[in-house]
Structure formats: C-alpha cells, structure tokens
Amino acid sequence: SFWSYFQNTYLCDSPNYNCRKTNLDIFSCRSEREFYDAFASAVLKQTSSKLEEWMENARLFLSRISPKISLGTEPMTDFSISLELNPKAADVDDILQLPEKIAQKKGIDIVVCIDEFQQIAEFKDSKAFQKRLRSVWQLQKSVSYCLFGSKKHLMNELFEKKSLPFYKFGDTVYLPKIGTEDWVDYICGRFEATGKHISAELAGKICRA
C-alpha cells in the first residue's frame, strides 16, 4: 500500500489532542457524484455522536443541496445520503467544506482518511475533479487528509506527475509488505474475536493464496 498525507495527522494519536478521524473507502465509487455521496455520509456519520447531531449538521451545512437521507435499522451507523447536486461550484464546495465547517463548529481538528484514492483517476473529467478537490482542501485549516492507495503506479502518477493537480500535495510514505507471521497473528486474532478458531497453518495458507 501507499499513501500521501497532508499536515500533521499523527497528532490524533495523542490523548491530549482534540481530534476526530473519518475513514472512507472509495473503491466502489465510479463517478464524481458517488464520491460526494460517500464523502458526505462518512463525514456526517463519523463526526457525530448521536442521530440528532448529524441531522442538524446536514441541515446546517448541506441545505442548498437538499440531501436525501435513508435510515436503516440502526440510524447512527446504518444510513446513506443521496445529494441532489446542481452544476454550481458552490454546491460542490459545500460538500468538500463539510469537515472544515464541522471542525470549526465543534472546536476540533479532523483527519479524513480516504482509501483506494487512485479510483478518482477513473472518473469522467478526472483532472477537473482533482483540481476542485485540491483547490478546496489546501485552504482548510482544521482538516488534514490521509490518502491511501493499493495501486502504487497510479498513486505515483497522481502525486508525482507535474501536470496533475495533486502534484506534491503532501508528504509521501511507502509502506512495506506485511510479513506472513504478522498476517497469521492478525487472522487468528480476528477469528478468536468472533469466538471461532483457525490454526496457524491454515491461516498461513490463506496468506499465501
């Protein structure tokens, strides 16, 4: 895996630092609109501690977009947002500014972690989309972005190609492959956490598959 990050994301690990993490996987996003829906849902869900709070934030900060919210059996964790987007840049900016506005309202810092970030290269008019993201994100004061990807060559292109908007957006870190022994320990531990058992030998076969 590979990631590029912006600002001091490690501060969130300090118990004395008032910071909230938001995690988002965009592997299944196939368009700019799907990205905005997933982005808004993740930010609202993971920065709010109760249903009323995230609904209030949606009303306050996304009112021009008329968000449609679908609730599941567990409203705090099972909901999705569909945004009635207009082509106006201001409407899109409202979505991209959502974590910054929530951070300022709550007096906290937020780190938005986006996995499989290389997917944005597949969007229609991707370069224009990348320009929009960077133009908004680089001016935010209370939000940092940790951008992960599993396709090293695509991530390299996004962040190292001079003609693309995310060129030198942040520091770049390459992660080494996870060792088989660590994978085996992790797999066995996850099985045990659910009351099940798997032998180290079988876990090793899974790693080598």
Language model segments and positions:
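Active-site catalytic pocket residues across diverse enzymes, especially alpha/beta-hydrolases
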Residues: 10-14, 137-140, 162-163
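Conserved Walker B catalytic segment
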Residues: 81-151, 160
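Conserved nucleotide-binding/hydrolysis micro-motifs of P-loop NTPases
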Residues: 27-31, 117-119, 150-154, 178-181
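C-terminal alpha-helical "lid" subdomain
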Residues: 101, 105-109, 192-197, 204
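P-loop NTPase nucleotide-binding core
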Residues: 1-110
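A short helix-turn-beta junction within AAA+ P-loop NTPase domains corresponding to the substrate/partner-engaging
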Residues: 17-19, 159-177
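A short helix-loop-helix "switch/interaction" segment in the helical subdomain of ASCE P-loop NTPases
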Residues: 201-209
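Conserved small helical "lid"/interfacial subdomain of P-loop NTPases
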Residues: 175-202
